[in-house]
Amino acid sequence: MKVLFTFGGIPHYLNAMLNRLQAKGVEITVFSPKKGNTTIGKGVKMVEGGTYKHLTTPEKKMFYGKSAFPALPEIIAEEKPDIVVVGWPYFLQVFFQPALRKAMKSCNAKLVIREIPFQTPPYGKIKEYFKANPMHDEGMRLLSKGIGFYLRQWITARIRKYCYAQAAGTLNYSTAAYDILPSYGVKKEQIHVTYNSTDTEA
């Protein structure tokens, strides 16, 4: 089995998991940004290299305001993986980039979404979620306010729902996924909790 992962960077726990999967006979290919990244938090130490194939590709901020790998359709056409694993915000490309859907369909690749569910509002409960879990920037200024913010969140929720409908499964950092993802139409058997663990059976 050949699995292609996209990451903004590779922290130690992901590196250990990828090495373990490679040792078990899974052919792992990882793509990460050619120059730095915009999706990994400050202070998170990155790992360079492993036993798996690690390549870089240009990352670009797209018209919808999030980072993406524009060359991902060409990468998939060349690598021909059985499974493509993408996390936030890269899985938004499934919605915004028809060429990506076409490339995956042409090689029968299954989509798996890596999610941080405790940062995802339940579908249809955006206002309630952000009232209970306010969003702040690094200067602790409140971001979750105003019509513009809630409109963006509503649109994002609908795009998430579309992307989840294309996925064969989800990998999640937290058991909160069992409470949140079904609201987007994800079946319980498609929800897999990995935590930040090197234990691939977790």
Regions found by a protein language model. Give the residues of each.
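Generic beta-sheet signal
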Residues: 6, 31-33, 112-115, 173, ...
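N-terminal subdomain of nucleotide-sugar transferases
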Residues: 1-56, 79, 107
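Nucleotide-sugar donor phosphate/pyrophosphate-binding loop at the beta->alpha transition
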Residues: 110, 119-162
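Donor nucleotide-sugar binding/catalytic pocket of nucleotide-sugar-dependent glycosyltransferases
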Residues: 149-161, 165-202
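An amphipathic, basic-hydrophobic alpha-helix
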Residues: 57-102, 106, 153-162
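Hydrophobic anchor at the start of a short beta-strand
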Residues: 3, 28, 111, 188-191
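An aromatic- and histidine-rich active-site surface loop
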Residues: 11-15, 38, 83-107, 111-129
